[in-house]
């Protein structure tokens, strides 16, 4: 399952527009009822847009990664929840710099198959490419072109790390809020 939320309380660190608010796209893997008839999800959504960025970020020629667009996962979009007597534990996944929300799909699927819900967020502008439901994009803007070290590195990265932490706190709060509304 995919989600997209806006944290209206936070300005977007990575853009010049003071009216931009922090926008997040994410993906959830959860214990689901078995379904053989539903189409499995591809590993890459929007492969025609993602492959160029993956090639660029990894330093590989595009032809070496085009096979990724044919990879199918075990996930079924909006599959029915597996009936359980108790709430499932939740794991948050936060990709590394220039990563993506679904980079560890195989781990997320394995955890979900063992009764654990996994929530992953594309940290917009820290992910190599975030594609929102309306088709707009947040490209990677976290490069350190000056190769800073020590205090300069920390001064450069700290706002980004704080943004990532705030992203995860927002997602947890939003899940709790939505869960309370459904109880």
Where in the sequence are the language-model features?
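Generic detector of contiguous secondary-structure segments
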Residues: 13-16, 101, 105-108, 117, ...
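Divalent metal-coordination and catalytic microenvironments
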Residues: 28, 111, 168
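Domain-level recognition of soluble alpha/beta enzyme cores
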Residues: 1-91
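Alpha/beta-hydrolase active-site loop
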Residues: 125-183
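Residues at helix-coil transition
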Residues: 30, 113, 173-177
């Amino acid at each position: 399952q995919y989600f997209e939320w806006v944290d209206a309380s936070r300005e977007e660190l990575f853009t010049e527009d003071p009216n931009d608010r922090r926008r997040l796209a994410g993906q959830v893997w959860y214990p689901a009822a078995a379904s053989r008839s539903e189409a499995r999800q591809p590993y890459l959504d929007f492969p025609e847009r993602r492959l160029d960025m993956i090639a660029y970020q990894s330093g590989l020629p595009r032809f070496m990664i085009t096979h990724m667009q044919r990879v199918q996962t075990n996930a079924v979009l909006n599959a029915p929840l597996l009936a359980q007597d108790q709430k499932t534990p939740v794991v948050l996944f936060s990709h590394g710099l220039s990563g993506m929300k679904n980079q560890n799909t195989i781990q997320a699927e394995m955890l979900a198959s063992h009764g654990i819900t996994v929530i992953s967020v594309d940290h917009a502008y820290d992910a190599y490419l975030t594609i929102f439901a309306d088709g707009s994009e947040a490209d990677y803007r976290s490069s350190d072109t000056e190769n800073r070290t020590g205090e300069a590195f920390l001064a450069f990265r700290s706002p980004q790390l704080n943004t990532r932490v705030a992203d995860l706190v927002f997602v947890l709060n939003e899940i709790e809020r939505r869960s309370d509304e459904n109880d």
